[in-house]
């Protein structure tokens, strides 16, 4: 059994073994995020799905109203004049077959890969490299598109892709410890709505199994999913 550090053990004693109201949970997470850097705030959500079945898989995108607080490096594989469009739109890496070859050789200095449909036959050959890292472009995720300028703009602004892993768990970063608890909650509410909206057609029984939030170096806190779902913004 992995031994907790003194810091983590101390922080964990401040958390009761119960389900917390959303804003209370976020306040605790912010208080415990006292590392010497701006910790990332993450959600870990267990869903009642079995992703080995195609009709129980979840993979989509969400545009968080306050972004994630993180800058991402975007690579674009495209052709012709779209290469210069990708550059103008702010892509960090861009190219045609040259970029495909570079990635195949191990150049993975990017967080997101966008490709135009005409390049997908070439990108498909990178499955061995991209697949395990979850970087293979996908139309559902908005990363296979002819509108690369808008795609780059949206992802740079905080739109992110997420999916359920093999165990049916969604891991999503949704802000920084420096965010207000209200901004974090608005991001979390948007994430919840996206997960509900994109509920797999084959999902059976209880959809939301558990919902935890945590920071990079802090303990996790369980959140009342019903309170998140029931919240209605004033006005």
Swiss-Prot record:
GO molecular function term, any single one: tRNA binding
Keyword line: Repressor, Ribonucleoprotein, Ribosomal protein, RNA-binding, rRNA-binding, Translation regulation, tRNA-binding
Gene Ontology process terms (BP): regulation of translation; translation
Disulphide-bonded residues: none
GO CC list: large ribosomal subunit
SUPFAM superfamilies: Ribosomal protein L1
Superkingdom assignment: Bacteria
Function text: Binds directly to 23S rRNA. The L1 stalk is quite mobile in the ribosome, and is involved in E site tRNA release.
Binding partners and assembly: Part of the 50S ribosomal subunit.
Matching HAMAP family: Ribosomal_uL1_B (MF_01318_B)
Family: Belongs to the universal ribosomal protein uL1 family.
NCBIfam families, per database record: rplA_bact
Name listed for the protein in its UniProt record: Large ribosomal subunit protein uL1
Source species: Prochlorococcus marinus (strain MIT 9215)
Gene, per the UniProt record: rplA
